[in-house]
Amino acid sequence: ATTKTLRILIDWEQGKVVWQQPRTPNATAEDWSKASHNLAYVKNYNLYITDNRGNQLQVSHDGSRELVYGQSVHRNEWGISKGTFWSPDGKSLAYYRMDQSMVTDYPQVDINNRIALCKPDKYPMAGMTSHEVSVGIYNVESRQTVWLDLGERKDHYFTGISWAPDNQSIYVTILNRRQNHDETWSFSALTGKRLQKIHEEDNEKYVQPQHPLLFLPWDDQKFLLQTENEGYDHLYLFDTKGNKLKDLT
């Protein structure tokens, strides 16, 4: 539970507060790990973590309106709704870094004030240069970031970020700019090295990756894949070597 000043963990069976932590004023995009009680958030364009002992760790230092950390990217397309992703043990944080310095401003009108205000937004018009996205992994214990080897095309779409249950690897779906081909790869969470392609989709019109992988709680070598690859939204059972084991729907 949260109040205006505190984040509180309550044991309902015992009827008492078992953990609490002060909230950071003006923090946005808060993402709390139930496993470690570490909290990620964005403030003044930079990404921070408050660990379970109350220490504030600054993950990024060069954030600005043009260089954005820990927030949703690609204009919330492809199932993207946030910019931080805790590992299952809550000790590592995957996050987006979006460089939009090359994107032109587009005028937006803010009508929340009595007199409307013009507030420019970074918006790439059709055919113009788009922003570039990277994915980093910050280790809370070492306080170091490694960057995933996503390839040379930083203007591709990167979505479906999902952690393996063992905290050692992470999965990302890479969608090309034409939006008709995607590949899902595993990466080392320790080095950022690209490990294995586990799934690929191709369509003459478009593909629509919308969902991260969902690992089975009782088998960390198998996961569910949700896709419209065959024309309708279906679930499939895969293993971590990329083998399709079963059509579930």
Description of each model-found segment:
Residues 1-5, 37-46, 51, 82-85, ...:
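Beta-strand C-termini and the immediately following turn/loop, strongest in propeller blades
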Residues 4, 57-84, 95-147:
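Predominantly five- to eight-bladed beta-propeller fold
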Residues 4-83:
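Asp-box/WD-like beta-propeller blade repeats and closely related beta-sheet repeat scaffolds
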Residues 12-15, 51-54, 139-143, 189-192, ...:
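Short loop/turn segments that connect beta-strands within beta-propeller blades
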Residues 19-22, 56-64, 146-149, 194-200, ...:
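Beta-propeller fold detector
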Residues 27-31, 159, 208-214:
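Repeated scaffold domains used in trafficking and secretory/extracellular systems
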Residues 65-81, 153-158, 203-211:
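Short glycine-/Asp-/Thr-/Trp-enriched loop segments that recur within the blades
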Residues 124-128, 153-154, 200-214, 249:
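Beta-propeller and related beta-repeat scaffolds in trafficking/envelope systems
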